[in-house]
């Protein structure tokens, strides 16, 4: 893993976008994208740039089960408001939270990924080491599937909802096996509350107990941190 440490998340987000631009200059056509507060500075850098994304395809990691695309807490809504409405892409794929059947939706999404191999995958990391909604215990060979959210993830996401009771209990998530097929991976982490997970991901053993540790098995991963998220690393 190539670890890059920045003073703040704004600088880190700009650097992540620089890597995406380099990839696009070298022919990248498919971006794997993430939601949540972590990639927002990267999306701001993308929106404020003069880069044209109209020939690019995006594939998002996950979506809450049960939320409509126009629900302001859905990940489709997040992507539209933070990026797609401001920088149009050729195609944008996000799991359908209102799909009638989980098996049908996960099969559809796995085909989307197979038909559009991801050149650059952007990830965040949860406090418990999850990537996407691949919680501790997730198999490393999994594809897209419907997953239950752990209580710690529900607690972490409750701040975005009116109450904890409103937080969805399930999500569709790209699996770790699918993530590892990406040609290049950028993992962003900011804040002291991510420091333990970052240390385990980089310096700990490869274990299903820390889903992000699977990235040690990938040949091209750039970990982009602010100083707080890097604060517990032995080597800086």
From Swiss-Prot:
Q: In which pathway does it act?
A: Amino-sugar metabolism; N-acetylneuraminate degradation; D-fructose 6-phosphate from N-acetylneuraminate: step 5/5
Gene Ontology CC terms, in alphabetical order: cytoplasm
- Note the Gene3D superfamilies from the entry: 3.40.50.1360
Q: Catalyses which reaction?
A: alpha-D-glucosamine 6-phosphate + H2O = beta-D-fructose 6-phosphate + NH4(+)
Q: Enumerate the Gene Ontology biological process terms.
A: carbohydrate metabolic process; glucosamine catabolic process; N-acetylglucosamine catabolic process; N-acetylneuraminate catabolic process
**Stored CDD domains:** GlcN6P_deaminase
Write out the GO MF terms: glucosamine-6-phosphate deaminase activity; identical protein binding
Q: Which HAMAP family did the record assign?
A: GlcN6P_deamin (MF_01241)
Entry's NCBIfam families? nagB (TIGR00502)
Q: What is this protein called?
A: Glucosamine-6-phosphate deaminase
The record lists the organism as: Lacticaseibacillus paracasei (strain ATCC 334 / BCRC 17002 / CCUG 31169 / CIP 107868 / KCTC 3260 / NRRL B-441) (Lactobacillus paracasei)
